Amino acid sequence: MVKAVAVLRGDSKVSGTVTFEQDSESGPVTVTYDIKGNDPNAERGFHVHEFGDNTNGCTSAGPHFNPFKKNHGGPTDSERHVGDLGNVKTDSEGVAKGVLKDSLLKLTGDNSIVGRTVVIHGGEDDLGKGGHADSLKTGNAGPRPACGVIGLTA
C-alpha cells in the first residue's frame, strides 16, 4: 500500500488535511479529507493541480493535473482531467469531511500525483457543464484559498 498526505494552508482561514491511499498500482485511490474554515452549507471545487510549487501561494500550483489533455469534467465523467475531484460539501460550520475513491488518480508511476498540489477552491465547480468560458478548463471554481503539496507518508 502507498500512502500520501497534504496539509492544506493558504492566505485565508481555510485549512485541513487530505490523505491518499492506494492498495495496488492498478487500484483506485481512496481520498479522505477534513477541511475547515469554508463558508457554511456550500460546495467547493476540489482538484489536484499540476505543480508542487506554492512559492507564490496556491497560484503557483498551475492548472489542474491533466496528462491526457482532456477537457474539465466531473469525477465520474469519461472526459475529465485526472485532477478533477468535483466538489466537497460543507456543513453548517463550514467543515467538509468525507471519503471518495478515484480510479484515475495514481500514487506511483508516470502520472503519480505525489509531489503535486491539492487545492480547495473558493467557489463551486460546475463540472464543465456551466457554459462559462472557464467551465471546460477549471469548472469556474474560483480562487484558491488553501492548498498543500502531496507527499509520501508512512
From Swiss-Prot:
InterPro entries found in the cross-reference section: SOD-like_Cu/Zn_dom_sf, SOD_Cu/Zn_/chaperone, SOD_Cu/Zn_BS, SOD_Cu_Zn_dom
A single GO BP: removal of superoxide radicals
Top-level EC class as recorded in UniProt: oxidoreductase
Single GO cellular component term: cytoplasm
Binding-site residues for substrate, renumbered to this chain: 144
Annotated positions binding Cu cation: 47, 49, 64, 121
EC code: 1.15.1.1
Chief place of localization: cytoplasm
CDD domains noted in UniProt: Cu-Zn_Superoxide_Dismutase
Family: Belongs to the Cu-Zn superoxide dismutase family.
Protein's UniProt name: Superoxide dismutase [Cu-Zn]
Organism: Yarrowia lipolytica (strain CLIB 122 / E 150)
